[in-house]
């Protein structure tokens, strides 16, 4: 048997999950995985069905009340993960952990060493979805163990908004892809979480269904929906539906959608890094191309 390494393309993060395939299964998988969203073209008779196994990754951006950190976290999944950025010096640390209900536990780690190494920081807290906050405690483990510190910390929105946060859930519809393992999303219904009413339907695309990202892509404090519309395995093309608070609707953004590359977010600098030639900074509601190649 052969150990197979699976890459989660949505996060741009390698997940070392051990799958055991026969050589025949591997060859079949490779052949079927070379094409994604455009591999299966629906006909008039292709039924559109509900796709229930889509993972919606909610990425939240929080400032600590002591002004030390910005925590950007993929939540709403069993293994929340993200980055704890330092605000009073350059850099930050990766964090990963577990989520049960609204309770989150995280620990920092060095990606080059792995999760087995002792953490520098641990975070435990409870998320409040209504006001987009997390109350918890941060424990620091310096090299000098005598100086371990524990501090109660309130994490509040990095970019606050006026009024209440929209409470949405998403329902996905599309069709089976006979040449791949994921279905194809052709419609997203935006549901008011409180009233259960459909407030908008997003159409006009073919997206891969393994996961979607719900994050503040244009740094206005509101979460936006990002869909993977890549046709090939390494085709980093995405559709961005940005939330407009004035109209209370999602609008597809052509500027970001025209740039190839997975967006790494740096909320404390209002920057998006999409590829080696595209580092953008949000200035006065507009994107400005930065001359350098890396954010931090």
Tell me what each language-model feature is.
Residues 42-153, 191-194, 198-205:
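Central antiparallel beta-sheet cores of small beta-barrel/beta-sandwich binding domains
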């Amino acid at each position: 048997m052969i150990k197979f390494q699976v890459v989660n393309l949505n996060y741009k993060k390698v997940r070392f999950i051990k799958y055991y395939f026969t050589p025949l299964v591997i060859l079949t998988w490779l052949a079927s995985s070379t094409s994604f969203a455009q591999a299966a073209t629906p006909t008039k008779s292709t039924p559109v069905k509900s796709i229930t196994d889509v993972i919606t990754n909610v990425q939240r951006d929080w400032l600590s009340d002591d002004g030390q950190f910005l925590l950007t976290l993929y939540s709403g999944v069993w293994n929340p993960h993200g980055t704890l950025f330092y605000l009073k010096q350059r850099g930050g640390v990766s964090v990963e952990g577990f989520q049960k209900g609204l309770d989150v536990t995280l620990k920092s780690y060095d990606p080059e060493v792995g999760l087995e190494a002792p953490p520098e920081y641990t975070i435990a807290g409870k998320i409040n979805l209504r006001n987009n906050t997390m109350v918890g405690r941060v424990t620091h483990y310096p090299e000098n163990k005598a100086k371990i510190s524990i501090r109660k910390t309130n994490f509040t929105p990095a970019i606050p908004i006026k009024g209440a946060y929209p409470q949405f859930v998403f329902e996905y519809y599309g069709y089976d892809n006979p040449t791949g393992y994921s279905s194809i999303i052709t419609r997203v219904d935006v549901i008011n979480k409180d009233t259960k009413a459909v407030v908008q339907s997003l159409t006009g695309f073919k997206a891969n269904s393994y996961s979607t990202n719900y994050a503040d892509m244009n740094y206005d404090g509101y979460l936006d929906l990002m869909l993977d519309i890549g046709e090939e395995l390494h085709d980093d093309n995405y559709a961005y539906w940005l939330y407009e608070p004035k109209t209370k609707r999602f609008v597809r953004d052509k500027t970001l959608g025209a740039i190839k590359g997975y967006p790494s977010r740096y909320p404390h600098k209002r920057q998006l890094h999409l590829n080696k030639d595209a580092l953008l900074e949000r200035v006065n509601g507009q994107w400005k191309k930065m001359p350098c190649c890396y954010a931090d």
